[in-house]
């Protein structure tokens, strides 16, 4: 195991202090060797092997869910011609000041500027127009996992706000009817909900307000989670595009009756922020706490070697390793020439769910000591119990992480009809209050409460609030407000 960033050290910043979260987060990314931030382009970072393995396991989990629901994977070029990018005026207006442009090929100035993909609607939909001919070609459901580029002018932060998003999963679908497209939105929400649940990431789903929806969409459903500092992080979006892009890019199909109709479209995306939220929500003062599904190693074995029985201890460790591998468990035996205490700290920092300690006493007694990373507690088990016990413990750890994260998340949601209380609580978490539905009052809430309007609950629900705190009119909706990344 190469030490890319030197000796691994536990974070020096307490994770429990919300005011110090940013420093803790930066230290953990460095100490656990998730990313190297020293790349000489602002907002662009290097995935290190351990972090990249976590990323790959997260990506594969999502890829499986998409394939199971009939999505097919594609890969589009990174460059988009300027005329194509600007064809949908409302869409480009939302991205124009963030686009990276390629203007030269070598020393020669290009006849037309090429954009580094900020998102792929304008690249994909001209191809949809070529691929879709009749009703028999529908629905069409594709996805790709690619890099996207946005010239972020806000404070950049690894995995949270980057100029090169290295893990952008975007799905795009086309349908014959509006009803089928609406059903696709529901399916996308279900896919993401299941995905976040399995990673133990708690969330709310909200319909974004008109002034904050995806450019060119009819409406946007967004998933937000709550970070330890009280700010929300958008971790996924689902967009109902209707026929807007189909009309722009002439995406039509021939009906059974022989008529030409525009298709209805949806798109939905997830990025590196999933990994960021998983690190932030589950981590503690000792470093990462990884859900077993996506941990590079689910179990690390630390042989506590002693003269006279060294060989026998290593043989027993090899036996345990083989037993667990047969059960489908990812195991690492750490036989480095290093003190057990240093190894314990190292793997706690890395967030490995279970540690098995094997020494002379365990060898003599036919036992093993198992340490749970989530609870920081040890338990002794008989050697022959391990193949049954370890998978059960991994499953229990996943459930416990989900439960713990959800309980903490729900404590960060506040319901109030008082403007003064909303103003005070908005920095602590998510505030829910009444809203008349007007953009004027929504924007005023953002100004007066000091947060961003996340939107209204999805699926829609009746509001318990009587009045809009801004205008005093009848509340038609519950609205969510929070400070955001």
Swiss-Prot record:
It comes from the Archaea. Its main location: cytoplasm. Pfam families: HGTP_anticodon, ProRS-C_1, tRNA-synt_2b. Keywords: Aminoacyl-tRNA synthetase, ATP-binding, Cytoplasm, Ligase, Nucleotide-binding, Protein biosynthesis. It is an enzyme of class 6 (ligase). CDD domains: ProRS_anticodon_zinc, ProRS_core_arch_euk. Consists of three domains: the N-terminal catalytic domain, the anticodon-binding domain and the C-terminal extension. This is Proline--tRNA ligase. It comes from Methanopyrus kandleri (strain AV19 / DSM 6324 / JCM 9639 / NBRC 100938). The gene is proS.
């Amino acid at each position: 195991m190469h030490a890319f960033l030197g000796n691994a050290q536990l974070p020096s910043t307490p994770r429990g202090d919300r005011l110090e979260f940013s420093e803790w987060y930066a230290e953990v990314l460095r100490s656990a060797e998730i990313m190297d931030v020293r790349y000489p382009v602002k907002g662009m970072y290097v995935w290190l092997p351990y972090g990249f393995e976590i990323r790959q396991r997260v990506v594969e989990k999502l890829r499986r869910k998409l394939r199971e629901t009939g999505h097919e994977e594609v890969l589009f070029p990174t460059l988009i011609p300027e005329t194509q990018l600007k064809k949908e005026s409302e869409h480009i207006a939302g991205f124009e000041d963030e686009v990276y442009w390629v203007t030269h090929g070598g020393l020669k100035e290009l006849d037309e500027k090429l954009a580094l993909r900020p998102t792929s609607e304008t690249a994909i939909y001209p191809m949809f127009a070529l691929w879709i001919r009749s009703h028999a070609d529908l629905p069409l459901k594709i996805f790709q996992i690619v890099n996207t580029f946005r010239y972020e002018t806000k404070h950049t932060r690894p995995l949270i706000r980057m100029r090169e998003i290295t893990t952008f999963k975007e799905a795009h679908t086309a349908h014959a009817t509006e009803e089928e497209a609406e059903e696709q939105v529901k399916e996308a929400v279900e896919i993401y909900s299941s995905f976040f649940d399995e990673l133990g990431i708690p969330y709310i789903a909200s319909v974004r307000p008109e002034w904050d929806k995806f450019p060119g969409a009819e409406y946007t459903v967004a998933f937000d989670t709550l970070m330890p500092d009280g700010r929300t992080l958008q971790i996924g979006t689902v967009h109902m595009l209707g026929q807007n892009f189909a009309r722009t890019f002439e995406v039509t199909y021939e009906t059974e009756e022989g008529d030409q109709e525009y298709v209805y479209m949806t798109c939905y995306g997830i990025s590196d922020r999933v990994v960021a939220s998983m690190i932030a929500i589950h981590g503690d003062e000792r470093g990462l706490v990884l859900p077993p599904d996506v941990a590079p190693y689910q179990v690390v074995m630390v042989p506590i070697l002693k003269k006279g029985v060294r060989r026998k201890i290593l043989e027993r460790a090899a036996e345990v390793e083989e037993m667990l591998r047969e059960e489908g468990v990812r195991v690492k035996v750490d036989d480095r020439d290093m003190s057990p205490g240093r190894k314990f700290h190292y793997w706690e920092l890395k967030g490995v769910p279970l540690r098995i300690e094997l020494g002379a006493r365990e060898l003599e007694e036919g036992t093993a000591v198992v340490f749970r990373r989530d609870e920081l507690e040890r338990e002794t088990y008989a050697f022959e119990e391990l193949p049954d016990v370890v998978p059960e413990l991994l499953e229990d750890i996943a459930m416990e992480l989900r439960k713990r994260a959800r309980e903490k998340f729900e404590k960060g949601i506040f319901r109030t009809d008082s403007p003064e209380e909303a103003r005070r609580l908005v920095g602590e978490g998510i505030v829910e209050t009444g809203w008349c539905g007007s953009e004027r009052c929504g924007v005023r809430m953002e100004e007066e409460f000091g947060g961003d309007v996340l939107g209204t609950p999805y699926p829609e629900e009746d509001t318990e609030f009587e009045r809009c705190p801004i205008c005093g009119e009848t509340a038609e909706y519950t609205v969510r407000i929070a400070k955001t990344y």
